[in-house]
Regions:
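Charged, often glycine-enriched C-terminal and inter-domain segments
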Residues: 21, 66, 91-92
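Histidine-centered active-site/metal-ligand motif
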Residues: 56-58, 97
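Asparagine-centered strand-capping/turn motif at beta-strand->loop junctions
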Residues: 99-102
Length: 133
């Protein structure tokens, strides 16, 4: 079921009230896998306003991020950028990166992972707002 919320221009923006049962929740929001196969995985990621993921890197995969709704603050190596709806970026393997929602509405993006190993344990955290290892 969809409901409408208002953006900064007072335009109606649909927001999901129900999260699929296969969604994995995190302190920063949630994600679920839309599709996966050999050497790829596609996720829908939602980041709560004012929250961010850890500063991290992956040894075995690259990530492509496409913003669907909201504004993403992306750290990729030493570069920091803002991405809006319909903009994207690429995170190579072994690159420190972080995703943040600086806005007041949920950030929604599609993540496409490619690599030989796509397990959730392929993560090295350098900083984490939630004290995860």
């Amino acid at each position: 079921m969809l409901r409408a919320v208002r953006d900064v221009n007072d335009a109606a923006v649909p927001a999901l009230e129900l999260v699929p049962s296969q969604a994995e929740t995190r302190p920063w929001g949630s994600f679920w896998v839309l599709d996966e196969g050999p050497m790829y995985k596609i996720k829908r990621i939602e980041v709560k306003p004012g929250h961010r993921l850890s500063l991290q890197m992956h040894y075995h995969r690259s990530e492509h991020w496409i913003v669907v709704r909201g504004t993403a603050k992306v750290t990729r190596g030493e570069e920091v950028m803002l991405l809006s709806s319909n903009e994207s970026t690429y995170i190579p393997p072994c690159t420190k990166h972080r995703l943040e929602n600086p806005g007041t509405l949920p950030l929604v993006l599609i993540e496409v992972q490619n690599g030989e190993y796509l397990g959730e344990d392929d993560i090295v955290r350098f900083e984490d707002d939630y004290a995860r290892q």
